[in-house]
Amino acid sequence: RGTVRSVAKAMELLQLLSERGEPLSLTEIARMQELPKSTAFGLLNTLREYEMVSQGRDGRYSLGIRLFEYGCRVSRAWDVPRLARPYLEQLAAQVNVSAVLSIREGDRVMTLDQVEGHGSLRVVSEVGGRLPLHCTSQGKVFLAALAESEAQALLGRRPLTAYTPHTVTDAAQLLASLEQVRRQGYAVEDGEYK
């Protein structure tokens, strides 16, 4: 596939630390990534040298300051959230609910920005966070915008995870519900994700 295994493993370690959101020990990281401790240590040590990972006094690892620096640079260089912000504010004020700017990345949705509405209905979406397509309003909007064959292929890649008892995990049922999203021009998530 043209990838370098050690770089891929290092990226997976960063992903783990990002998703967990709390410092992890070498033993925890090695176990979660199914790596020998010596391999995990070597990867973490290299990432620490480049300040992509930091190690606390207790020996636990977390994301490093260099990633924050890179994130700030990307944020400054990418105008989409800044340009969209006035429209999000206007929309949130008009409809009295939260307005969210998202992009689709494969089978996930990433939140770029959000503006809280003043009504009782609120969207809780972490900027920079990734959400599943099949059980979030943003994800359903993206799915509805695709050709049906493309949406079907995307949903058929892996089983649809049930996050709550209300999550639709049957691809055919979800595809049928997308017709309503197309007709009304918006999607609703009603206890399907959280």
Language model segments and positions:
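Intrinsically disordered, low-complexity polar/acidic regions
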Residues: Y163-T164
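Amphipathic alpha-helical effector-binding/dimerization core
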Residues: S62-R158
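N-terminal helix-turn-helix
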Residues: R1-R82
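Extended hydrophobic
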Residues: D170-K194
